[in-house]
Amino acid sequence: IVRCCSATCKXSCVCCF
């Protein structure tokens, strides 16, 4: 699992917010 912190967080990742 990858951690995405961008506003367009999607796909196989977990948002930081």
UniProtKB/Swiss-Prot annotation:
Tissue distribution: Expressed by the venom duct.
Coiled coil: none
Keywords tagged on the record: Disulfide bond, Secreted, Toxin
Family per similarity comment: Belongs to the conotoxin M superfamily.
Highest taxon listed in the record's lineage: Eukaryota
Gene Ontology molecular function: any one: toxin activity
Domain characteristics, as noted in the entry: The cysteine framework is III (CC-C-C-CC).
Protein name: Conotoxin reg3m
GO cellular component terms, semicolon-separated: extracellular region
Compartment list: Secreted
Disulphide bridges, residue numbers: 4-15, 5-13, 9-16
Organism listed in the record: Conus regius
